[in-house]
């Protein structure tokens, strides 16, 4: 009888601890679709390289610019900051009220990177930058570049070091 009570007590104790732990863990996760961090007035993102209409080699450097906001890594909840997301050949924008998914077409730069080496197949491509907050959710209002079009060609001239 004492053994059963002891086992029941231990079982309830373990169950209670699990429920409390689960509640604490979910408190640290960003709410999905419930909040968008405000962006600074006049905030913008753009490409330093490449530019719209450029012909680039299959492997090339993409450099991001941000104005009016600071850069902070994903997970760092700091007002007026965020990090870049690169949209590659995206024809339909994702839901701006939800965290951006990480896919081959939506690249996350959650460490605060402002440059990346990109390799694309030859042909026409589009690139667009989207700035998002600590939880990968776009700001409100959205801070997004215009879409640029580039052509990837093995015959592209090497980048001019003076232009970068």
Q: PLM ranges: what are they?
A:
Residues 93-95, 132-140:
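Short acidic/polar inter-strand loop motif in beta-rich domains
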Residues 60-64, 114-116, 123-131:
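Short, well-structured beta-strand segments within conserved domains
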Residues 65-76:
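Short amphipathic, basic-aromatic surface patches that mediate peripheral association
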Residues 76-84, 144:
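Short coil-to-beta strand junction motifs in C2/discoidin
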Residues 27-57, 160-164:
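Short, compositionally biased P/S/T/A/G/V-rich stretches that sit at domain boundaries
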Residues 96-118:
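A beta-strand/beta-hairpin structural motif
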Residues 9-18:
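Bacterial N-terminal signal peptides
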Residues 141-163:
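Short beta-strand elements
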């Amino acid at each position: 009888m004492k053994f059963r009570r002891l086992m029941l007590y231990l079982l309830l104790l373990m169950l209670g601890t699990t429920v409390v732990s689960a509640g604490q863990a979910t408190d640290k996760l960003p709410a999905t679709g419930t909040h968008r961090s405000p962006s600074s007035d006049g905030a913008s993102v753009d490409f330093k390289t490449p530019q719209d209409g450029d012909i680039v080699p299959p492997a090339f450097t993409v450099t991001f610019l941000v104005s009016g906001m600071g850069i902070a890594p994903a997970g760092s909840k700091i007002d007026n900051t965020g990090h870049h997301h690169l949209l590659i050949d995206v024809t339909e924008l994702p839901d701006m009220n939800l965290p951006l998914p990480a896919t081959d077409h939506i690249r996350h730069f959650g460490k605060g990177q402002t440059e990346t080496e990109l390799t694309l197949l030859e042909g026409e491509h589009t690139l667009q930058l989207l700035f998002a907050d600590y939880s990968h959710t776009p700001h409100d209002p959205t801070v997004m570049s215009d879409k640029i079009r580039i052509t990837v060609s093995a015959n592209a001239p090497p980048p001019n070091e003076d232009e970068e």
